[in-house]
Structures are given as C-alpha cells and as structure tokens.
Curated annotation (Swiss-Prot):
Family: Belongs to the purine/pyrimidine phosphoribosyltransferase family. PyrE subfamily.
Protein name as catalogued: Orotate phosphoribosyltransferase
Catalytic activity: orotidine 5'-phosphate + diphosphate = orotate + 5-phospho-alpha-D-ribose 1-diphosphate
Residue sites binding 5-phospho-alpha-D-ribose 1-diphosphate per the record: 96, 100, 102, 122-130
Catalytic activity, EC: 2.4.2.10
Keywords: Glycosyltransferase, Magnesium, Pyrimidine biosynthesis, Transferase
Pathway: Pyrimidine metabolism; UMP biosynthesis via de novo pathway; UMP from orotate: step 1/2
Enzyme class: transferase
Gene responsible for this protein: pyrE
Oligomeric form and interacting partners: Homodimer.
Required cofactor names: Mg(2+)
Binding annotation for orotate: 126
Length: 209
C-alpha cells in the first residue's frame, strides 16, 4: 500500500478527518465544507505520529536532499517539525504567524543563519497562505526555503496557484483525492457521498450556497 493510502487510512481511523457531506462544516474563512481535518489529533497516537514523522523525513531527503534546518509553523507544525528534525539530526526553529508583541518581538524562534537551506513543516494545506507567511519570514531572515512538507493537502486550486506564484515546492504525505477514495473503500462514505465530495473540490467557495 502506498504512503498516501496508509496515511489517509490512519487519519480516518483516528478520526483526525471527518467527512459529513450532508452536514457541512464552516471553516474560519467562511467556506462550507463536507470535510474537516484536525491533524493535531495525531499527537495522541504514538504509532501514527511516528509513521508520519518517518514518512516526512524520508520525503524531505528524497525531494530536497541536504538541508540545514527544519522549521515548524506555529502551532500545529511544531511537534511534527521536532520529531522530523530528530530523525534527520538537524536544528529546528518554529515560525509564528506574526512577531511577538512582547519580549524580543521574535517571529522566528530558534537560531537561523543567512544562506541556510530550510524546509517548512505544516500539518495541513488549504489555501497555503499561512505556510507562505512562514516562508516569507524565513527568507527575510536570510534563509533559503527549499520547500514545504505537509501531512495533508485539500489540493484546492487557490492553494496550488499561490504556491506556484511564489515558486515554493510542496510535498505532502496524502491528499484529498486519495483520502476520499480510501474513505469509500473502507465504507466511511457511500457512492452518493463521493459525488458530493467531488463536487465540493471543483468549487469550494460556491459549494453549498
């Protein structure tokens, strides 16, 4: 079984992903969605989080080669970045969404030097906006961000466009299309639900309105 399918299966099993085609969730952005993904739940399942960390570490080595620093996005990316940096035996930093308003006023916590090659670790990619803020902060600090590694992506057109425009490479362990296929095969959803789930992906902003 592929990594994509294994991770999708695990996320469904521990209920980190909820699929409710008939009772949609409302995201903070206002988008109505038949799916809600909360990868923070992986923290409570040692075997799942270990598999995720190992898979991210392998994917980073295969895709980006030698890097100098692993950066986690605050807050959900931090634990995964810590485990991955341990496996790769590399320094780690984390990046806030904005600079602190007290103390040193840091946006990046941990040492970063000019020219260091960095991979940003994120738990989830929707539009990619928060990840790109982290990339921007690291580049302003002089780092060379070689890409983003995430557990899951919705694969939304808006997110793909933003990442392409910024020239940032994204690798993920699994994605929306793989996940809904696994959900159908494992009887989490019906064939009718699948049609709804596919429709949402085509136009999330207008779906359910």
């Amino acid at each position: 079984m592929s990594i994509e399918k294994q991770v999708a299966e695990q996320l469904l099993e521990i209920k980190a992903v909820f699929l409710k085609p008939n009772e949609p969730f409302t995201w903070a952005s206002g988008i109505k969605s038949p799916i809600y993904c909360d990868n923070r739940l992986t923290l409570g399942f040692p075997k799942v989080r270990q598999f995720i960390a190992k898979s991210l570490a392998e994917k980073i080595k295969q895709t980006f080669g030698e890097i100098d620093v692993v950066a986690g996005t605050a807050t959900a990316g931090i634990p995964h970045a810590a485990w991955v940096s341990d496996l790769l035996d590399l320094p780690m930093v984390y990046v806030r969404s904005k600079a602190k308003e007290h103390g040193k006023g840091n946006q990046i916590e941990g040492p970063i030097s000019k020219g260091q090659k960095v991979v940003v670790i994120e738990d989830l990619i929707s539009t990619g906006g928060s990840s790109l803020k982290a990339v921007e902060a690291l580049e302003e600090a002089g780092a060379e961000v070689v890409g983003i590694a995430a557990i899951f992506t919705y694969g939304l057109a808006k997110g793909k466009q933003l990442l392409e425009e910024s020239g940032t490479k994204l690798v993920t362990l699994t994605n929306y299309d793989e996940l809904i296929e696994v959900a159908l095969n494992e009887n989490y959803v019906t064939g009718e639900d699948m049609e709804t789930l596919k429709e949402w992906k085509k136009n999330p902003e207008k779906w359910g309105k």
